[in-house]
Amino acid sequence: MRLIATMLAGLALFLAPNFVRASWDGAAPADEPRLVAALFRSSWCGACRVLEPRLEDVREDYDGAAIDWVRFNFTWGERNGLRDIAVAEGIAPLYDELAGRTGFLVLMDRETGQVFEIITMDYGRDQIREALDRWLVVTERLESVEGQ
């Protein structure tokens, strides 16, 4: 019941009259999932070593779900090529803001640039699943409303 109330509250936030579509570095292709899960990681990051096994376990449950999983690996400090990935995914502004930081997964709306939630090592597997489920519902509802 609490999960449903949380989802409805989140949906209300995004369907409010002041909802504004942000401009991005080009429109995302229509076949790309709206929900983006962007992992900022490196091999030397302690938080990454805690978070990543949890994400991998949970990710298996979401094969075929409308989630675009993107991974930015800052292990060698090289940023060349990573921004190209961000541009291709339509999330360059997010990358520009967070490049070099590690140890978290950003759940965001590709079309508006809205960051829904930042998942850290403090999240357990169940909390990660709840976050993914919550924002999948929101993005699906946004698409259905916008498609009318």
Question: Which functions belong to the PLM regions below?
Answer:
Residues 2-19:
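Hydrophobic membrane-insertion alpha-helices, especially the h-region
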Residues 19-35:
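A short beta-strand-turn-helix
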Residues 31-45:
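Short active-site neighborhood of thiol/selenol oxidoreductases, capturing the structured segment around
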Residues 45-49, 105:
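The canonical Cys-X-X-Cys-His
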Residues 49-63:
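Typically the conserved alpha-helix immediately C-terminal to a functionally engaged Cys/Sec
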Residues 64-84:
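Thiol-based oxidoreductase modules, predominantly thioredoxin-like and allied folds used
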Residues 77-112:
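Structural alpha/beta surface segment adjacent to cysteine/selenocysteine redox centers
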Residues 99-143:
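Non-catalytic, surface beta->alpha helical segment in thiol-disulfide oxidoreductase systems
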